[in-house]
């Protein structure tokens, strides 16, 4: 099920489509709260994919065979490519995912596997190197961590995938860390990130 939400949050109209990939699990997610502050500043037309509601499936042998058959025919209209088409056509992308086990929730990896469709979001040169086909010029990655945000196996992976495989030239990390460590005020740390977004980002 493709979750779509369209909004106009900015006083200045923009025609760009911003895709919000929401990998947050909790209803009161701090990561989502920060991401929505960013979306409010970006404005324009927005579509949201709530990964927890997508029932994403791993790429089994049967699904891989089916996908290969379709891509070899150049048939990208099949419903199994709906999320990939949406990702490819977005002008700007915001991914929100908490920092879990030095990385991010498994559902985000499932999403990336499902949208990485050769011929749609990426292709390969004669030398075997990926060449991105995505329209987006920038990808934002929003995350929060209960402790220190190290090592970086989440944004670093997303950044490399975006630039080297999807053809998205610019990426930016927004993070709040130490949220569950005694002596740190989680609300203040989240509020500080939101204030930074409101002061620095605007169209």
How would you name each of these model-derived features?
Residues 2-97, 102-117, 195-203:
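N-terminal beta1-alpha1-beta2 submodule of the flavodoxin-like/Rossmannoid cofactor-binding fold
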Residues 17, 45, 137-139, 170:
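Residues at the starts of beta-strands that form the adenosine-phosphate
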Residues 24-28, 146-149, 179-180:
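Short histidine/acidic/glycine/proline-rich micro-motifs that form metal-
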Residues 49, 142, 174:
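Hydrophobic residues at beta-strand termini and immediately following loops
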Residues 90-91, 136, 168:
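Short, well-ordered alpha-helix to beta-strand connector turns
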Residues 117-127:
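Conserved nucleotide-sugar donor-interacting segment of glycosyltransferase catalytic cores
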Residues 125-165:
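Short, glycine-/small-residue-rich phosphate/pyrophosphate-handling segment
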Residues 152, 157-203:
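Glycine-rich phosphate/pyrophosphate-binding loop and the adjoining helix
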């Amino acid at each position: 099920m493709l979750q779509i939400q369209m909004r106009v949050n900015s006083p200045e109209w923009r025609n760009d489509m911003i895709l919000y990939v929401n990998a947050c699990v909790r209803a009161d997610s701090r990561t989502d709260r920060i991401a929505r502050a960013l979306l409010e500043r970006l404005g324009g037309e927005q579509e949201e994919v709530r990964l927890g509601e997508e029932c994403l499936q791993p790429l089994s042998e049967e699904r891989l065979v089916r996908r290969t058959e379709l891509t070899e025919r150049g048939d990208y209209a099949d419903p199994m490519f709906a999320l990939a088409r949406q990702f490819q056509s977005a002008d700007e992308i915001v991914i929100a995912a908490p920092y879990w086990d030095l990385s991010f929730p498994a559902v985000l990896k499932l999403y990336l596997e499902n949208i990485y469709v050769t011929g749609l979001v990426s292709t390969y040169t004669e030398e075997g190197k990926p060449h991105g086909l995505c329209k987006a010029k920038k990808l934002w990655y929003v995350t929060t961590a209960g402790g220190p945000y190290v090592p970086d196996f989440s944004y670093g992976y997303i950044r490399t995938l975006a630039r080297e495989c999807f053809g998205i030239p610019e990426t930016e990390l927004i993070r709040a860390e130490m949220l569950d460590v005694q002596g740190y005020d989680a609300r203040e740390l989240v509020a500080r990130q939101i204030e930074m977004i409101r002061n620095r980002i605007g169209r």
